[in-house]
């Protein structure tokens, strides 16, 4: 499956000829290289391993260096993904942004913005308690326990806690523009993560 590792630059808007405004997210791509292959005989399935963004020298361990010995002029990469069903590439080849030329829709995976410790109303969209009439709770989640049996709170109950910082995929985002010169694409709508965060862009599954 077609895919690239990119960086979310931010959002802007594009005006169509009829005056309609389209909100778009700009995703910029640093060079993506094929750094390895997985085969059916050795791994049980076939796939390409792609990497992007050079890893700082101080963070490169000996095992990682060993993986790149056979690759000429390619530094160890910080972000690595697997691409299944993508043929015609060998180790050391670069995947360029023009692979999305024939793609109309993409799925974008990123890490959502971290919100820290949040209450149940913000985290789970609970209604909270009454706002007036002598209520002693307003933004609480209500009861979490059970009756005499089982006399405990079940694991996984929705409560206050750490919010955000999760892996999330937005599907079927329309590709509005491909800028080969600046190695970027513009997709309609928002994608997960803050400005400058890295995302994985793949051809839409649906």
UniProtKB/Swiss-Prot annotation:
Q: Name one GO cellular component term.
A: cytosolic large ribosomal subunit
Q: Does the keyword Ribosomal protein apply?
A: yes
| Alphabetic keyword roster | Ribonucleoprotein, Ribosomal protein, RNA-binding, rRNA-binding
Q: Name one GO molecular function term.
A: structural constituent of ribosome
Instruction: Give the top-rank taxon of the lineage listed in the UniProt record for this protein.
Output: Bacteria
UniProt-listed InterPro entries: Ribosomal_uL3 (IPR000597), Ribosomal_uL3_bac/org-type (IPR019927), Ribosomal_uL3_CS (IPR019926), Transl_B-barrel_sf (IPR009000)
Q: Where is this region: Disordered?
A: 127-151
Gene Ontology BP annotations: translation
User: Key word rRNA-binding present in the record?
Assistant: yes
Cite the PANTHER family for this sequence.
Answer: 50S RIBOSOMAL PROTEIN L3, LARGE RIBOSOMAL SUBUNIT PROTEIN UL3C
Assembly: Part of the 50S ribosomal subunit. Forms a cluster with proteins L14 and L19.
Report the protein's function: One of the primary rRNA binding proteins, it binds directly near the 3'-end of the 23S rRNA, where it nucleates assembly of the 50S subunit.
What family name appears in the similarity comment?
Belongs to the universal ribosomal protein uL3 family.
Write down what this protein is called.
Large ribosomal subunit protein uL3
